[in-house]
């Protein structure tokens, strides 16, 4: 509810300069908005992505769930914008109602494209990164030629998945601090996301400064090499 408040000084500056400022409806969440991803625990089958995830995170698996379609639910990181087109990931961080609301607000000037086959968890920025018009970076642990969103049919594609493993310091904090606190919270009868860690592929979440310059995590040496090979300046 209050995360976006940190950006208010910037948003007000934009607003005073003529920008439109819209915000999604706040959900009531007076029900269980999370639905089981699998029918039951016995239905879980590890995918190739799951196995790769375990190797990169010391054996951990992502906790998966789906969102109910009772209210508009989505996070901004669930979308990536390419000019007048937006790609929206239907996932644990955005439901179909969210995509419908976004299209209704943006109107005919923008087109909202949905995908739900490329990533089962939250946010799109560890799966799809648009580097410049006509060139996209795709997480090959999730995206293939078969399930690649149609919006990229005419784009050049860089498939990549060889990110650096989750750091030992991050794993140590998770095991020694977050996990124990999470268990205590569960014992009190509350739910918590303290058991969840960022995907190791969040290392693909670079920042484009312009069409030739990108800011990349210095640990992601393989990604840096790929981008340099494709004539990008790396910061």
Language model regions located:
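The feature marks the mature, well-folded catalytic cores of soluble enzymes
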Residues: 1-235
